[in-house]
């Protein structure tokens, strides 16, 4: 049985989702770092909900963050490194 590229990508995506779940549950950075490493190695774009679920600067998953909403902009502040990220939303 041959392993196709789709099979490998499917397995990588499932592993990324599982690592993200572990990161959210435990609050551990190493799962986020491993998840990014897999996505980069397999040339996979992370889904938007995963991309927005952790701090890009310190790689800590958002758990108890400060969220502000103004018009069509959501501002999230990381509780660890105080980095601020802004996301556009449509209403």
Curated annotation (Swiss-Prot):
Chain's role: Part of ribonuclease P, a protein complex that generates mature tRNA molecules by cleaving their 5'-ends.
Subcellular location(s) of the protein: Cytoplasm
Cofactor annotation comment: Binds 1 zinc ion per subunit.
Gene Ontology process terms (BP): tRNA 5'-leader removal
Gene name of the encoded protein: rnp4
Chain coiled-coil ranges: none
UniProt subunit comment: Consists of a catalytic RNA component and at least 4-5 protein subunits.
Cellular component annotations (GO), alphabetically ordered: cytoplasm; ribonuclease P complex
The EC number(s) this enzyme carries: 3.1.26.5
HAMAP family per record: RNase_P_4
Cysteines joined through disulfide linkages: none
Amino-acid positions noted as binding Zn(2+) in the UniProt annotation, renumbered to this chain: 55, 58, 78, 81
GO molecular function: ribonuclease P activity; zinc ion binding
Entry similarity comment: Belongs to the eukaryotic/archaeal RNase P protein component 4 family.
Keywords: Cytoplasm, Endonuclease, Hydrolase, Metal-binding, Nuclease, tRNA processing, Zinc
Cofactor(s) the record lists: Zn(2+)
Catalytic activity: Endonucleolytic cleavage of RNA, removing 5'-extranucleotides from tRNA precursor
Protein transport keyword on record: no
Domain of life: Archaea
Record-linked InterPro entries: RNP4
Annotated protein name in UniProt: Ribonuclease P protein component 4
Protein's organism: Thermoplasma acidophilum (strain ATCC 25905 / DSM 1728 / JCM 9062 / NBRC 15155 / AMRC-C165)
């Amino acid at each position: 049985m041959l392993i196709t590229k789709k099979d490998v990508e499917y397995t990588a995506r499932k592993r990324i989702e599982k690592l993200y779940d572990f990161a959210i549950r435990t609050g551990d950075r190493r799962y986020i770092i491993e998840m990014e490493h897999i996505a980069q190695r397999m040339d996979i774009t992370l889904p938007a909900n995963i991309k927005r679920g952790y701090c890009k600067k310190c790689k800590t998953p958002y758990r108890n963050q400060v969220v502000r909403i103004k018009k069509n902009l959501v501002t999230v502040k990381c509780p660890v490194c105080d980095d601020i990220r802004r996301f556009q939303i449509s209403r």
